[in-house]
């Protein structure tokens, strides 16, 4: 019945209301993923029937699929002080997402960007609603309309928010200055381009589909969340090597080009 009442056509994107909630992580059903992409009503119903046979009783979020690949996404991180004034904004252009079932939709690599018009619009919105704290805003550029479609606002920094540090912005320092010391400076608007990545360079070279982006990334040394030159304990280096090696296997097995498949 839900599929028949959708205000948009297939393809669609479907995800649990909280894919990190214990009731979803602990349930098991065939084809379980963090996020689903469906071309047809039949594909969607097959998943729902499978899910209904599990212990999951939460809600599902259904969204229209906006055409475009990973690089059409945008993520905006900001910090609003205790008075509701935005103090920092950093825009990122994801160039690659994860595709394995447990991580699909999470960003694997991001180029930090600047966009004055978008900063202005989102700053006015956040201040108008009296938002306080960190915000992690996911959106996608819709080439059909020339506008951004805002998906969600997360009230925390995301796992990929280290791209802000690559651009030179320390969100945690801003929080400390505000809450602990009561210091509030002018709003910082990032305009620096820098590369953050949580996967090896070889994966970016192979799976980033835009030739222009692949060429642009060659200009930047990637900042990696997991790598720390001051902590080269053999056990840690070994675990990192295993993690990076596993990414080659995961992408080879699960990757698909959204811009072509949909």
What feature does the model see in each segment?
Residues 166-173, 179:
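Glycine-enriched catalytic-core subsegment of oxygenase/oxidase enzymes
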Residues 61, 134-136, 185-191:
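Flexible, glycine/charged-enriched surface loops at secondary-structure junctions
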Residues 96-99, 103-107, 154-168:
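Glycine-rich phosphate/pyrophosphate-binding beta-alpha loops
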Residues 127-162:
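Conserved metal-phosphate-binding beta-hairpin within the catalytic cores
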Residues 101-105, 112-137:
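Oxyanion-binding "anion nests"
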Residues 1-61, 82-83:
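Active-site nucleotide/adenylate-binding loops and adjacent lid/helix of ATP-dependent enzymes
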Residues 38-100, 113-121, 141, 147-149:
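Phosphate-binding site of ATP-dependent enzymes
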Residues 177-262:
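Peripheral (often C-terminal) accessory segments that flank ATP-dependent C-N-forming ligase machineries
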């Amino acid at each position: 019945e839900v599929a028949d009442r959708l205000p948009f056509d297939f393809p669609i994107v479907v995800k649990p209301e909280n894919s990190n909630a214990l009731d979803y992580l602990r349930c098991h059903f065939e084809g379980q993923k963090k996020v689903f992409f469906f071309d047809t009503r039949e594909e969607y119903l097959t998943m729902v029937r499978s899910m209904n046979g599990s212990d999951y009783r939460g809600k599902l979020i259904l969204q229209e699929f906006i055409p475009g690949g990973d690089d059409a996404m945008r993520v905006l991180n900001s910090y609003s002080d205790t008075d509701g004034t935005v103090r920092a904004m950093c825009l990122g252009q994801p160039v690659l997402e994860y595709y394995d079932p447990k991580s699909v939709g999470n960003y694997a690599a991001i180029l930090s960007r600047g966009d004055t018009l978008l900063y202005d619009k989102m700053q006015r919105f956040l201040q108008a609603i009296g938002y306080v704290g960190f915000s992690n805003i996911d959106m996608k550029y819709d080439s059909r309309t020339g506008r951004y479609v805002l998906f969600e606002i997360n009230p925390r920094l995301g796992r990929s928010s280290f791209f802000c540090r690559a651009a030179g912005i320390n969100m945690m320092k801003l929080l400390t200055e505000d809450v602990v010391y009561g210091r509030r400076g002018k709003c910082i608007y990032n305009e620096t381009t820098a590369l953050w990545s949580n996967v090896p360079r070889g994966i970016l070279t192979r799976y980033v589909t835009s030739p222009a982006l692949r060429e642009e990334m060659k200009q930047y040394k990637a900042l990696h969340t997991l790598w720390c030159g001051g902590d080269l304990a053999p056990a840690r280096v070994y675990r990192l090597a295993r993690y990076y090696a596993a990414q080659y296997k995961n992408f080879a097995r699960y990757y698909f080009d959204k811009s072509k498949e949909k």
